[in-house]
């Protein structure tokens, strides 16, 4: 199962009709990984503060606060997966062998 993770991104690009040859150059931007990780976690923490502690309820005109909290935690799990998979994926692949 872990070996199929390498094929997900090309399959998604194929479905949307986008070439993935530009992904070869992304290794040059590895130095930006940690700062962008910090920025995304700070933005998510700010969203948590707005959702849980803010007096003014934001984005609640069409959806209840309870649904927003459930959606927040679902997105949090997905975000943590995408932020950590470059670190965890080699470990998972090593366990599979």
UniProtKB/Swiss-Prot annotation:
Identify the domain of life: Bacteria
Q: Where in the cell is it found?
A: Cell membrane
GO CC annotation: plasma membrane
Q: Keyword set for this entry?
A: Cell membrane, Membrane, Transmembrane, Transmembrane helix
- Answer yes or no on keyword Transmembrane: yes
Q: Does the keyword Cell membrane apply?
A: yes
Predominant place of localization:
membrane
**Topological relation to the membrane, as annotated:** Multi-pass membrane protein
List the transmembrane segments.
Answer: 7-27, 34-54, 69-89
Name the record gives this protein = Uncharacterized protein HI_1049
